[in-house]
């Protein structure tokens, strides 16, 4: 294990990509990389190193990548474009060092950036867009990245003592050869990724910050001769390293990027992730899910199309009700509080929608607890939704566990209980669901994966969450073998052989 205690003087560094500020002479260097794609773990053919500095403001990183200028692919791309054909380098940081969440930061040779959050060992979510700085410079034989990541960028556990231990992984992609070099013996395409991060020791700074984003909008409809005025604010308060409070008052999400176009001919609802900053920021503690099958909390439900019951009105009013339907609901307020300590985390999320014509706003509440031990994490996530137009109350309770009996095996499971009471239509149902997964990597070239999903016919978490289907069972086992020790003259970089079987049953079919 590598523990680096870094110098803690305040640094005056200009983030311009040139790495020519005097402070870089004090930096710790890291040069040990492995070729992890293909997964040979050999010494890389190309040289690269990382420079690391810190002060009370955050972490400074310098990437030095040896490469002839005429071979560098520096294509501009959209933020978070994972498949962009360009040379890249970056890192992932587990600020708590517990293997539950890691934040990734990537910079392309063009200067384009990507950031996201890793959970469940190697599952990444790119909806998180953070506020950090980077710059790139390319000369004849090297290209460089300067990066600054503030301590306020993500929630961190409150720890005692002079130092904080985080875990890091650095990487570099050479696009022309599609080779990846990493400082750990793994990558996100392997079954083990986050658990392989190297520990680093930084000074334990006490940080606090508060950001306000007020707004005022005025719209004038000259046809209807109506003037609409709206004002509100979003507040992000990082109380200290472990506590964070976010408040949105009558928020305006008009600047959020649109969803991707999805053509769906199935009977299942399409899941859309939330790109609204308030709901994507500081959400990792509440992110309890089962791959793409379910999400206990789907924040896209908050502010979605209102509920209506136009049939309760007489014909003229019924027609007016139908004509008044809107596709989104304004939000009166939303609040999120999270607190993380060395062994215990908890959080609260609540939101209330505004009343619309012929509709009443819904209320959403969620409470999260998580207890962390040396090799096991136990959690509870509960949600409650009130939908007054439907006279509907929905409760969901979920228990989750992540267990690592050794460094080669990982077990995670989630148990879900749901209950719906709806006066309109006299609908009452209780359901249960379960997810189990075991992954094992006895050697670097062999892995096993056992999995189980179950939803009974009355499971319904869709009021505040998302589930792809009900009355469903899926179980299976998969084994894989990877070969990457091919000679330089071979046409192959790596081969992978997988053998698996499974059984799937739903109300529609069995396979």
What is each PLM-predicted segment?
Residues 6-365, 370:
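Structural preference for beta-rich elements and adjacent junctions enriched in aromatics
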Residues 17, 212-214, 247, 337, ...:
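Membrane-embedded beta-strand positions of outer-membrane beta-barrel proteins
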Residues 59, 243-245, 343-348, 373-380, ...:
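Repeated loop/turn-to-beta-strand initiation elements of outer-membrane beta-barrel proteins
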Residues 67, 151, 174, 216-222, ...:
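Transmembrane beta-strands of outer-membrane beta-barrel pores
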Residues 89, 210-212, 229-235, 274, ...:
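Hydrophobic, lipid-facing positions within transmembrane beta-strands of outer-membrane proteins
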Residues 94-96, 150, 236-238, 338-342, ...:
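Structural signature of outer-membrane beta-barrel channels/translocons
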Residues 330, 394, 406, 410-511:
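Exposed, low-structure sequence patches enriched in small/polar residues
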């Amino acid at each position: 294990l590598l523990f680096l205690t870094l110098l803690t003087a305040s640094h005056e560094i200009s983030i311009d990509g040139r790495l020519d500020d005097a402070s870089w002479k004090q930096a710790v260097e890291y040069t040990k990389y492995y070729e992890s794609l293909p997964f040979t773990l050999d010494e890389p053919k190309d040289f690269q190193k990382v420079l690391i500095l810190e002060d009370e403001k955050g972490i400074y990183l310098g990437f030095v990548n040896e490469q002839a200028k005429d071979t560098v692919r520096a294509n501009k791309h959209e933020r978070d474009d994972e498949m962009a054909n360009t040379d890249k380098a970056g890192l992932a940081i587990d600020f708590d060092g517990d293997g539950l969440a890691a934040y990734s930061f990537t910079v392309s040779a063009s200067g384009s950036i990507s950031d996201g959050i890793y959970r469940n060992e190697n599952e990444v979510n790119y909806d998180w867009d953070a506020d950090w700085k980077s710059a790139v410079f390319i000369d004849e034989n090297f290209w460089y990245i300067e990066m600054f990541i503030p301590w306020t960028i993500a929630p961190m556990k409150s720890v005692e003592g002079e130092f904080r231990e985080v875990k890091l992984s650095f990487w570099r992609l050479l696009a022309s050869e599609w080779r990846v070099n990493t400082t750990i013996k793994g990558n996100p395409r392997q079954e083990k990724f986050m658990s392989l991060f190297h520990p680093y020791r930084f000074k334990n700074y006490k940080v606090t910050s508060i950001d306000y984003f007020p707004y005022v909008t005025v719209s004038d409809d000259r046809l209807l001769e109506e003037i609409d005025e709206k004002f509100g604010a979003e507040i992000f308060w990082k109380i200290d390293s472990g506590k964070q409070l976010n408040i949105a008052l009558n928020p305006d999400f008009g600047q959020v990027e649109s969803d991707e176009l999805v053509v769906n001919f199935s009977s299942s609802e399409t899941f859309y992730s939330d790109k609204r900053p308030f709901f994507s920021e500081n959400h990792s503690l509440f992110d309890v899910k089962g791959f793409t099958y379910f999400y206990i909390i789907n924040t896209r439900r908050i502010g979605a199309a209102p509920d209506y019951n136009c049939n309760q009105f007489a014909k003229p009013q019924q027609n007016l009700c139908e004509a008044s339907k809107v596709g989104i609901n304004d939000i009166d307020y939303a609040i999120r509080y999270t607190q993380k300590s060395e062994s215990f985390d908890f959080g609260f999320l609540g939101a209330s929608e505004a009343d619309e014509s012929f509709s009443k706003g819904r209320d959403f509440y969620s409470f999260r607890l998580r207890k962390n031990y040396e090799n096991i994490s136990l959690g509870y996530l509960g949600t409650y939704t009130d939908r007054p137009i439907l006279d509907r109350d929905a409760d969901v309770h979920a228990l989750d566990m992540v267990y690592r009996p050794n460094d080669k095996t990982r077990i995670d499971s989630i148990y879900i209980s749901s209950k719906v009471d709806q006066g309109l239509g006299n609908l009452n149902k209780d359901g249960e669901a379960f997810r189990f997964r075991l992954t094992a990597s006895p050697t670097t070239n062999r892995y096993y994966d056992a999995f189980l999903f179950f939803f009974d016919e009355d499971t319904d978490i869709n009021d505040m969450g998302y589930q792809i289907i009900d009355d469903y069972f899926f179980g299976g086992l998969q084994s894989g073998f990877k070969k990457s020790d091919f000679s330089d003259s071979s046409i192959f970089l790596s081969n992978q052989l997988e053998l698996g079987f499974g059984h799937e049953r739903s109300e529609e079919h069995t396979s």
